[in-house]
Design a protein with these regions (language model features):
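Cys-His-centered catalytic/binding microenvironment captured across papain-like cysteine peptidases
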Residues: 1-107, 114-160
């Protein structure tokens, strides 16, 4: 089989600014971020039909990593208490998974429920309807699993 090429959706100007165009959008019933009920949310990720062939073979995986842009996030923090909880340490934004980041890029590893054409259905994606999708990658334990990962004790207090 021959490689099928496509055009990049990103670019960088001479000043170093990066532009990224989404390859699709999320479609679900969530209108605003909510905690903690993400585990039951089913989302359709609708990919631009130009990239449908890029999904071929994804059905063989049980989980995918979704990269998306949190376009509805209105605040940018440098330090805070995660989830606004003062019983959690006051930490830097890069020491937590909160959405109030300088670059509103997010990633989530989720269960792949199925695929039909240019649409993949996933479960437990913490995303709002209409959120731009930047990339989809298969979850592969050989690359993504970290054995004996160390995390602070306060993480177990967070609501997921």
């Amino acid at each position: 089989m021959k490689t099928i090429f496509c055009e990049f959706l990103d670019s960088q100007d001479k000043n170093g600014a990066i532009k990224i165009k989404p390859l699709g959008k999320a479609k679900n019933s969530v209108t605003k971020p909510t905690l903690p009920d993400w585990k039951d949310v089913v989302t359709e990720i609708v990919i631009d039909k130009t990239y449908t062939k890029g999904l071929d073979g994804i059905e063989e995986y049980s989980h995918v990593i979704v990269v998306y842009w949190m376009d509805k996030e209105k605040e940018c923090h440098l330090k805070h208490h995660p989830q606004g909880r003062e019983d959690i340490p006051y930490i830097g934004i890069f020491a937590c998974r909160c959405p109030q980041r300088p670059n509103r890029i997010a990633i989530s590893t989720v269960e792949l429920v199925g695929r039909k054409g240019n649409i993949i259905t996933v479960k437990s994606l913490d995303i709002v309807n209409g959120t731009p999708i930047l990339d989809i990658k298969p979850y592969t334990p050989q690359y993504d699993e970290v054995k004996n990962a160390k995390v602070p004790g306060w993480v177990s207090k967070l609501v997921f």
